[in-house]
Structure formats: C-alpha cells, structure tokens
Amino acid sequence: MGKQVEIFTDGSCLGNPGPGGYGVLLRYQQHEKTLSEGFYRTTNNRMELMAAIIGLETLTRPCKIVLTTDSQYVRQGITQWIHNWKKRGWRKADKSPVSNVDLWQRLDQAISRHDIDWQWVKGHSGHNENEHCDELARAAANSPTETDTGYLENRD
C-alpha cells in the first residue's frame, strides 16, 4: 500500500434539512490540504458522508488511511451496516430502502482501493482537526454554492 494519509472530516447543517456543508483536512507527512463546499438544501448525515467521500476521492493513488470522523452514522455504516445492505440489495433488515443510498454507494466505491482505519472522535470536544473541519463545514453551509441533487431525488 502507498502513502500513509490522515483524513479528518465533518459535516454541518443549518436546520435538518437546510443549508449544509462539509469540511475535510487531508494530511500527508508535513503537507496539509483543506476542502469544503456548501449546499443549498441537504441533511447533516449527507454532509458527513460527503466529507468522507470527497476526502477519499481526492487521493490519486491507493493509500493507507486513518480517517477520523465525529459521525457514528458514517463510521458504523461503513464498518458494520453496509455489508448487509449490499447483500439485501441496498435495503435494511425491515426491507425499507437505505437512506442516502447514492452516497453510501459512492463511499463504497471510494474505499475500494484504500486500506482504511476508521476512527471516531466526539464532536465539539476540543479535537483540533475535528474543530477545524467543523469550522470549514459551518462556513460552507453559511455560503452554499451547490445543489445536493441526491437529496432532492431521494426525498420522501
């Protein structure tokens, strides 16, 4: 496996649904890069997923990654729930469709070439990188520029 990279992510939503954004910090050795984007109408879970997806999709070659998120939804979804969702044709145990399936499928694709250690950190607990991503996500949510077409298409 290639480079060892750290990725820190956070999503934010001003209302749920409402304007939202994601923030990402990528670190390789002494190099850091931040990414963020805001959406006019979305949900907090979609922004948490987008943060992880964008962080992973930014990498140009397979890497060994430690990805830190404050979202149990993302961490549990990708490490525990996704296997059964895929077996059931992207349905939950009660046969209902998986929420945010467009993003779960995109995340599933994004992880396929990497070796990832998924870490969870409590949000708003003073973790420097998580706090920085939270600031990026909130700023993006306050200045949205994009339409979350997946949210619009998958709305009940």
From Swiss-Prot:
- The name this protein carries in UniProt is Ribonuclease H
Its needed co-factors are:
Mg(2+)
Keywords attached to this entry: Cytoplasm, Endonuclease, Hydrolase, Magnesium, Metal-binding, Nuclease
Answer yes or no on keyword Metal-binding: yes
GO:BP terms for this protein? DNA replication, removal of RNA primer
Q: Name one GO molecular function term.
A: RNA-DNA hybrid ribonuclease activity
Question: What does the record give as the reaction this protein catalyses?
Answer: Endonucleolytic cleavage to 5'-phosphomonoester
Q: Report the EC number(s), separated by commas if there are several.
A: 3.1.26.4
Tell me the subunit arrangement.
Monomer.
Annotated compartments: Cytoplasm
Q: Which Pfam families match?
A: RNase_H
Q: Which residues bind Mg(2+) 1?
A: D10, E48, D70
Q: Which gene encodes it?
A: rnhA
What residue stretches are annotated with the RNase H type-1 domain? 1-142
Residues that, per the record, bind Mg(2+) 2: D10, D134
Q: Which InterPro entries match?
A: RNase_H (IPR050092), RNaseH-like_sf (IPR012337), RNaseH_domain (IPR002156), RNaseH_sf (IPR036397), RNaseHI (IPR022892)
Its family remark reads:
Belongs to the RNase H family.
**Where does the protein principally reside?**
cytoplasm
Note accompanying the cofactor annotation: Binds 1 Mg(2+) ion per subunit. May bind a second metal ion at a regulatory site, or after substrate binding.
Q: What does this protein do?
A: Endonuclease that specifically degrades the RNA of RNA-DNA hybrids.
Question: One GO term of the cellular component aspect?
Answer: cytoplasm
